[in-house]
Structure formats: C-alpha cells, structure tokens
C-alpha cells in the first residue's frame, strides 16, 4: 500500500537522522495516519516475533505488534517500567500466574478514525538496535490475504473423555460437599488435526466475523505456535482510578431457534444453581478488590448472549484508592472464581491435582497495560495452533463451573458447546 510505503520511508528517515542521547532508555518514533486496513492480514505478512493482537470487546480499538525491545516476566518490574517510561506494555498472565509483558518493536493501534504506529528502539544500544528495527521494517508495507478456514478436521486426542471428565466433576463435587470449596471450574483440552495448514490469523479473522461481542486475541511467540481466542469475558478495564469488571458465570444454550433461545434465557435468569454460581463470582471479585478500592457498585444481573451459549453477567465498577495500580489489581483478581473457583488458592491447588494438563495461557489474561489505561480480557474460548509441514494441530480448551447441584453429564455438554465456538468455524454447514 502506498500509504504504508510512505510511513515506512518516514520511519527510516527519522531513524537515520536521529542523534543518540545519553541516558535515553527507549527511543520512540511515531506516525499517525487515517489509513486503516486489516491488522490480521498485516500480521500474517510479518516475519518477526513475538506477535500480539487484541481486538477490544467494544470494537472501537485494535492493537497489533511484532518483535520486542523489552520483555518482563515479573508484574512488578513491568509496572515499574510503565511508570518510569510512561509507555504501555502488551501481555498478561498465564492461568497459574507466569507473566509475560513486552514493549514491542512495532505497535499499531487502530481506532475508528485512523491509526497510530509506533516504533521503539533501545536507546542504550541505539546503533546496534536500529539495525534490528530497520530489518523489522523490511516487510512493513506488506499484507497477506486472509484465507477461508473451512476444511476437514479430525479429533486426535483429548485430555479426558466424557467418563473421565465426569469423574473429575464428581471429585470436585466431593470437595464442595466436604466444605473445602464452594466452586471449582474444570476444563478439558481437545486436539484436532487439520487436513491442510491452518494460519492462526485466518482462524481468528473468521472468529471475528461470527463470534460477536467478544475480545479477539492472539499471542504468537514463534511462527510454529500461536495462542488465539474469542473471549466474552472482561477481567478489568481501568481509566485512571476508575475500574470496571464483571462476573460472567452461569450458562445456557443458544441456537438457531429464537423461541428456544428465549426459553433458555428465561430459565437461566430464574435458575437457582446458575444464580448461585454467578453470585460466588461476584463475592470473589469484591473480596479480592476490597483492599484496593474505596467503593464498589454491583449492577443487576443481565444476559450476555453469544453464538453458541448465553451467560449471566453482573457488571461491577469501583474507584481505586490512590497509589493502587495494575500490579495490585492483576495479582489480586486473577484468576477469578469464573475460571478457577472459590476460595481462589484452594481452587487452584485442587485443579493442579484433578486436571491432567497445564492450562498455560488458557483462562489466563491478556491485554494492554499503560500509565493511565489498562484493558485485560480473560483468555477463555481459546486454542493453540501448532504448525507442521503439511497440516496443523488445533488444541481447543473449554471449562465449566461446578457448584453444589451440578450434574456431570450436563456440564460435559456445556464444555462441548463452548468448544464449538471455534471448532465450528472450520466445519462445513456448522455456523
């Protein structure tokens, strides 16, 4: 594209004209343009990693990045860097707390009225690092067309079949009966082999079309492996000291029949078990936030309707105390009772014993963290895509909240339904 070629030339000229300054930690070059284009098609053409993509749930903002100038595996160090440099980082926490935050090489932030493109170079070793930056710009103007994802897929493995997963549920219910837990969220992983190579960018673009009202995210740490998903769930959003979060828990089906969907909605809004499950998440969030906020407002229950399922949701807003920031909120809130259980620590310990796999990024959190603004989603409805020579492997995750009164077989059907949000995109006549 001519405009991207022009922006690339501007960046190269700015880099070559820059005179390094002593004690300048990060050098920032920035360009604004009214041009908009598919960030996923752009990412597909880029060769530098890690790659990050986040499409905000409100639909107004998208972020895409390639490469990295700084990387942090500690939330405190990441938060300190943000305050010191007044720059935003991308990344998040895996389910069990391992952190990854990066200052990318190139960051594209797309809004409805245009785009801001930012290039970062390490000021402490500018001459060496500018060569990496220039190499990263070599394909800046390129895009690769997104392809259809419809193809044959076959199930090759699952961490638990129906019988074993239902046994996990029975064990979880036993812990609830004994008073060790009030809720536990059990998940499963199912792996499919595709008939032809499947690009993560292609599948995520397809998901954006059909899985509306969601965050859409991708974290590709290499060309061979990417984590993607379309999550309905906000962990939290912060503007200054204003915090917004939500309790998303309690599930019913959604399908093609509007009358049946309405019946499911009415049932969900009046079902005591689902109401209780959602209230546990509200209680868990409020309890974890309490040391860091001045006041909490909880709104009335509403429905969050998706393509395959619908959920109970209660929006929660709070005013942060002065001096409290993202480090405090992230570590206090994650993982919420919506994806782990309650009490938080005991639920995580139980999951390590019951589930026979490491969740890594599933039910973690990914987002943007800056000085005045943060936006994090919960990485559910997600999958890993691994590339082989002639095909790909798609490993899909789904979970269900188990509380007193949960019926194992119904919970199994729920996770099957949730997994279809991504799997059905590949299958003919399954949308």
UniProtKB/Swiss-Prot annotation:
Keywords: Isomerase, Magnesium, Menaquinone biosynthesis, Metal-binding
Enzyme class label: isomerase
Gene Ontology terms describing biological process: menaquinone biosynthetic process
Transmembrane segments: none
Pathway it works in: Quinol/quinone metabolism; 1,4-dihydroxy-2-naphthoate biosynthesis; 1,4-dihydroxy-2-naphthoate from chorismate: step 1/7; Quinol/quinone metabolism; menaquinone biosynthesis
GO MF entry, a single one: isochorismate synthase activity
SUPFAM superfamilies per the UniProt record, alphabetical: ADC synthase
Active site: residue positions: 183, 233
Cofactor or coenzyme needed: Mg(2+)
Residues that bind Mg(2+): 277, 414
Cysteines paired by S-S bonds: none
Record flagged with keyword Transmembrane: no
A Pfam family that the UniProt record links to this protein: Chorismate_bind
Enzyme Commission number: 5.4.4.2
Reaction equations catalysed: chorismate = isochorismate
Record-stated family: Belongs to the isochorismate synthase family.
NCBIfam families cross-referenced by the UniProt entry: isochor_syn (TIGR00543)
Function: Catalyzes the conversion of chorismate to isochorismate.
Protein name per the record: Isochorismate synthase MenF
Species of provenance: Pasteurella multocida (strain Pm70)
Name of the gene encoding the protein in the UniProt record: menF
